[in-house]
């Protein structure tokens, strides 16, 4: 009985915090985008071995934040590092671990996303997680990759409520299969185009004639611009976009976006950087403008089993995709990134947070009508 009462209280509180609407991705509403097909889950976890975990922190009237962990493979990541690259679309952000990734071309930990003032907790959590793994008793240096967006309008960000243990929990809870989207994990308190943002994900599987590779993307959306969905000027029609306060009084929306791209195509860090650049093109397709105050970062990784980097090896031999075979992966990255960004909006709920501030969800019914009328 006690457990049942607690569940009822929790649901009641969440009902006051979140404004519910039916949750479907853009594709589930009947609007597939792009020319390539998604994987089974239309998620980053369609890439074999990739897992995602969330810790969502909603407490009282003002705590609206969390942690999202992306685990690139199920082995010892520190010993079997993944080829990686990071591309900075606009550098107004606090992404940790950038310089070593750029110098060495690999990532040796799970990738963690959280809020701006919890990056330090994220680093500590990732480091502690890595040090406690079997065989790491002599490890004295860990390059934790921790990204962020600023959820300080809805969340009491100054309270620094995220703890290192929450980061460890998110990593340990990471799983394959369907990925929770919307107001979860690092996307709990984010805003996007003036609406409630969050976590979004999507994937593309290339035909066998193009290699059969999978590209998966996960995003944390907290950015602005003039929302465009599959070519439809949604933000303009809804009169909700950046710079509209030059026409009528409205709040200017700014912010950041973290994009994580994973593929099983055998790529080195150089071509992964080229892939990461294409994710920014996907962001542009949504109407994002990489504004002055936006931290827009892309983390790209390859988890092709034969190309993992053995930290104990003195020489490394790998087979990588030729430059001439990259174009289809570029296109798949653009498609999956754009759809992941849109999904973060479609899957989010309106939320009330710090100081009674409220952010509405994307008005899905109106948007669907616009998309249907376009046809």
Predicted segment positions?
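Hydrophobic h-region of N-terminal signal peptides that target proteins for export
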Residues: 11-19
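Intrinsically disordered, low-complexity sequence elements enriched in Ser/Thr/Gly/Pro
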Residues: 1-2, 25
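Alpha/propeptide regions of enzymes that mature by internal proteolysis
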Residues: 21-375
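Sec-dependent signal peptide recognition
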Residues: 3-8
């Amino acid at each position: 009985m006690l457990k049942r009462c607690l569940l009822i209280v929790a649901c009641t509180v969440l009902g006051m915090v979140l404004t519910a609407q039916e949750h479907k991705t853009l594709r589930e509403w009947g609007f597939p985008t792009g020319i390539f097909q998604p994987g089974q889950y239309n998620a980053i976890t369609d890439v074999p071995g990739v897992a995602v975990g969330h810790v969502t922190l909603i407490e009282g009237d003002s705590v609206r934040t969390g942690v999202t962990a992306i685990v690139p493979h199920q082995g010892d990541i520190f010993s079997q590092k993944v080829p990686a690259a990071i591309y900075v679309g606009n550098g107004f952000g606090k992404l940790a671990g950038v310089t070593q990734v750029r110098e060495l071309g690999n990532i040796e930990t799970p990738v963690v996303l959280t809020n701006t003032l919890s990056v330090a907790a994220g680093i500590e959590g990732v480091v502690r997680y890595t040090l406690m793994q079997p065989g790491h008793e002599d490890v004295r240096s860990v390059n934790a990759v921790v990204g962020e967006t600023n959820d300080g309008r809805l969340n009491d960000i100054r309270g620094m409520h995220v703890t290192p243990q929450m980061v460890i929990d998110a990593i340990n809870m990471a799983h394959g299969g369907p990925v929770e989207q919307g107001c979860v994990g690092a996307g709990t308190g984010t805003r996007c185009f003036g609406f409630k943002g969050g976590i979004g994900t999507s994937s593309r599987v290339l035909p066998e004639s193009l290699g059969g590779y999978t590209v998966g993307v996960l995003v944390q959306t907290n950015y602005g611009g003039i929302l465009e969905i599959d070519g439809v000027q949604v933000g303009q029609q809804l009169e909700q976009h950046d710079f509209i306060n030059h026409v009528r009084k409205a709040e200017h929306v700014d912010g950041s976006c973290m994009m994580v791209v994973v593929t099983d195509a055998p790529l080195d860090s150089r071509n992964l950087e080229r892939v990461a650049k294409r994710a920014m093109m996907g962001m542009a397709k949504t109407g994002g403008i990489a504004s002055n105050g936006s931290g827009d970062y892309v983390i790209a990784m390859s988890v092709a089993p034969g190309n993992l980097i053995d930290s104990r090896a003195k020489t490394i031999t790998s087979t990588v995709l030729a430059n001439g075979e990259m174009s289809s992966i570029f296109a798949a990255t653009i498609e999956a990134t754009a759809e992941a960004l849109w999904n973060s909006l479609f899957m989010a709920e309106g939320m009330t947070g710090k100081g009674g501030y409220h952010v509405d969800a994307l008005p899905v019914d109106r948007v669907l009508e616009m998309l249907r009328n376009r046809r």
